[in-house]
Amino acid sequence: MRIHGTVGCEPILELFDSFYASREHHRDLAWLARLGEWSRAHGKVLGMQANSGCLRQCPFQQFHDNLHGHNRMGQSKVGEQFGFSVFRCKTNYDRGNYEDFLRATWIRPEDLPLYEEHVEVVKLATRRHAHPVEVLNAYATYSYDGDLARLTDPSYPFPQAFDNAALGASSLWPQVRSCPDANDCRHCGRCTALLGEVFRPHGAGEPSDAHAASAFTRFYKG
């Protein structure tokens, strides 16, 4: 997911048949359309990840990914002894920068059809997720009633919920989702205003584990 355009693909055309688009450009439909057209013209399969909980342009991403192959959990514990966390997203959210979740790269289940016409594979991160069936059900049915943060991986335990229904009903969401300055934020105030609309106390309406188990049965057995 470090391919930012066709230039990165051209030197290795004979080495791959599928690839994933850069997370940082996931919400840019015009860019995704161009990459999808190029992929089809060259016989390649284009994919994207829909539920990444990573910060947009996270400066710790490469470091964090490297730790996956080098005893990440052990090194994390060592780091904690020195007051250092390898999870910069956690540190960032601990500081109260909750609007950064809205300007990240995840895709709402209801918005997925906007992107599916350009990609052939939609990846869902569930390997270490606490509620994998809930994630599968949400994206398979293009519908989710609850806290959007529960769908992402990593999933930070925010003090309140990102109400998906409120997000879908907000006139600000399309502007934030398709913001042309997403990778060079001007801090215009839209994300902060949107946070005020959708960041709500956790409630009884959020899906339970029992709901997730039922959804799993419906999804796989009909």
Regions found by a protein language model. Give the residues of each.
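Active-site pocket-lining/capping segments in soluble small-molecule metabolic enzymes
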Residues: M1-G8, L15-G222
